Design a protein with these regions (language model features):
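Extreme N-terminal starter segment of soluble prokaryotic enzymes
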Residues: 9-11
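Extracellular beta-rich ligand/substrate-recognition surface
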Residues: 13-21
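Glycine-rich beta-strand-centered segment in the early N-terminal region that forms part
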Residues: 29-43, 58-104, 120-121, 140
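Short cysteine clusters
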Residues: 46
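NAD(P)H dinucleotide-binding glycine-rich loop of Rossmann-like/cofactor-binding domains
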Residues: 103-178
Length: 181
């Protein structure tokens, strides 16, 4: 019996270098036993994404060979799990909604989705979540109704952290900000 391999295509905004973003369709490799294939439903855009697009390899999270292995942009995203590698089937199932914690800091590296990975980022139709995300506990089941709320969790935590830091360092804010969901 011949095993039929599914060819998975994705369309994504990918970084090829400084000021070089391209909307491209490409094939995703088959996932390994330690990876998870997801469909992205919602992705937020961050100021650090803009800085990454302008700086290219000068950005601390962008790998040096991005021209040969373009990185999928976007790190604040949520969606649906499509396929689960056998080593994670005890915890994750196809059809489950997800969000993630993008600040991985895996083994001291600065790599994170949206800057560093060829097949892992939020500005895409589908992506492959690598093993280190599950190893770090950064892939999270999402039980909310609206995907956009999950993709806004990281920016909201940054805003709350900034106000908390300002309070504890006695910085005097010179502006007002209202956040509502």
């Amino acid at each position: 019996m011949i095993k039929e391999e599914l060819i998975m295509k994705a369309k994504a905004v990918r970084l090829h270098g400084a000021n070089d973003l391209r909307l491209e369709e490409f094939e995703l490799p088959e996932i390994t036993d330690d990876e998870i294939l997801v469909k992205v439903v919602s992705d937020s855009i961050c100021m650090s994404t803009y800085k990454c697009a302008i700086l290219g390899t000068e950005h601390k999270r962008v790998h040096e060979d991005v021209a040969e292995h373009p990185a999928i942009m976007g790190h604040e995203f949520a969606g649906d799990i499509v396929k689960v590698g056998k080593n994670h089937q005890h915890q994750f199932k196809a059809g489950m909604k997800f969000t993630l914690q993008p600040a991985l800091n895996y083994k001291g590296t600065m790599w994170s989705p949206g800057y560093s990975y060829e097949f892992f980022g939020g500005d895409t139709t589908y992506c492959i979540i690598p093993a280190e995300v599950m190893e770090l506990g950064c892939l999270l089941e999402y039980k909310g109704k609206a995907y956009y709320e999950a993709s806004l969790a990281e920016p909201m935590s940054c805003s709350i952290g900034a106000f908390n830091a300002a309070y504890h360092t006695q910085m005097v804010p010179t502006f007002s900000l209202a956040i509502s969901l």
